Amino acid sequence: MCVEESEGAERLDFGEPAAAAADAGKSKSKSPDELPSPRMERVCENTTAADFKQNKSGNFVPNIRSGDWSDIGGRQYMEDTHVCITDLAKNFGYQSVDNEAISFYGVFDGHGGKDAAHFVRDNLPRIIVEDADFPLELEKVVRRSFVHADNQFAKTTLSSGTTALTAMIFGRTLLIANAGDCRAVLSRCGTAIEMSVDHRPCSLSEKLRVESLGGYVDDGYLNGLLGVTRALGDWHLEGMKEAGNPGGPLSAEPELKMITLTKDDEFLIIGSDGIWDVFSNQNVVDFARRRLQEHNDVKSCCREIVEEAIKRGATDNLTAVLVSFHLEAPPQVRVSRPGRVARSISAEGLNSLRTLLRNQ
């Protein structure tokens, strides 16, 4: 496992003791002007081709390939980060269930600094694995692990926050957990399927939840301060959260979506909100399919998505992770056009048309 930055490589061992990782996260918070400005940063394992065993519930066996790319975009400093882990249990020294890997992917979009995003990236996967109910009650484990990671970050007294979106794949099961405005989109036979909901103050359901907990929305911002209604961190902001009280208007609890993958499911795209500022769900699926049909390289596809977002005027940090469920490129899809009527001409009509054309 590594952390890579284009300006000087930093390495992090995910197998290090939890205490050491916690000590490393307790450094003094820096102002945005003091933070480095790497062009690209990622935490990733080599996930070129991790094969899954035959799943007893069906014939489809996902063949997992993942790629990733990040760019600082138009910002002065980089607050996005992400993680890709082929085998979550093995990565932390645990035995996989039935020797079947659980792969883990996460995108974390920090605000007010990068400390919260890096803390959650480094600690959330470990917290999930160390839960007593992992992996048998995965939904329950993931939900409370988000909250636990949030509470652990509060102890660092660092002043920043982060949105978080994770994807876990176990056999044919895909579990998405989201707190914030990163987004996951699935391509199913070329059709974009939204796998997460953006948690923003403009969302009616989120606005009602916030108001029921004593918060308010002012000019599109939570309590006039934040552009998201769910995030980890931000403990320094008054009126958002309170230690020991899970009922604040800013929630770290994720919304979950779980599905069973089929052969029609081609790939999953996870992106920070900078991607979705300039791409619609269907647009990014169409773009990715065309690129994969050209070269079938998942990492190059992520780079091209990020570069295209910059060309379209994206100004935020940009992160894209693509997880393909097949070794082959997506097939061409024939688009049906409703309302088109097939028409033919008789032999007599064809002769009349020829005569008419000759006489002109």
Curated annotation (Swiss-Prot):
Q: Does the keyword Metal-binding apply?
A: yes
Annotated binding of Mn(2+) 1, by residue: 109-110
Q: Name one GO biological process term.
A: signal transduction
Query: Which domain of life, per UniProt?
Result: Eukaryota
State the residue spans of region: Disordered.
1-39
Where would I find the PPM-type phosphatase domain in this sequence?
65-325
**Binding residues for Mn(2+) 2:** 109, 273, 316
Catalysed conversion reaction? O-phospho-L-seryl-[protein] + H2O = L-seryl-[protein] + phosphate; O-phospho-L-threonyl-[protein] + H2O = L-threonyl-[protein] + phosphate
Bound cofactor: record note: Binds 2 magnesium or manganese ions per subunit.
Query: Which molecular function terms from Gene Ontology are attached?
Result: metal ion binding; protein serine/threonine phosphatase activity
Note the Gene3D superfamilies from the entry: PPM-type phosphatase domain
Q: What is its EC number?
A: 3.1.3.16
* Entry keywords, A to Z: Hydrolase, Magnesium, Manganese, Metal-binding, Protein phosphatase
Show the CDD domains listed in the entry: PP2Cc
Q: Does the keyword Acyltransferase apply?
A: no
Per its UniProt record, the required cofactor names are: Mg(2+); Mn(2+)
InterPro entries, from UniProt?
PP2C (IPR015655), PP2C_BS (IPR000222), PPM-type-like_dom_sf (IPR036457), PPM-type_phosphatase-like_dom (IPR001932)
The protein's matches in PROSITE patterns, at most eight in alphabetical order, are given as: PPM_1 (PS01032), PPM_2 (PS51746)
Which family does the record claim for this protein?
Answer: Belongs to the PP2C family.
Under which name does UniProt file this protein? Probable protein phosphatase 2C 54
Q: Which organism is it from?
A: Oryza sativa subsp. japonica (Rice)
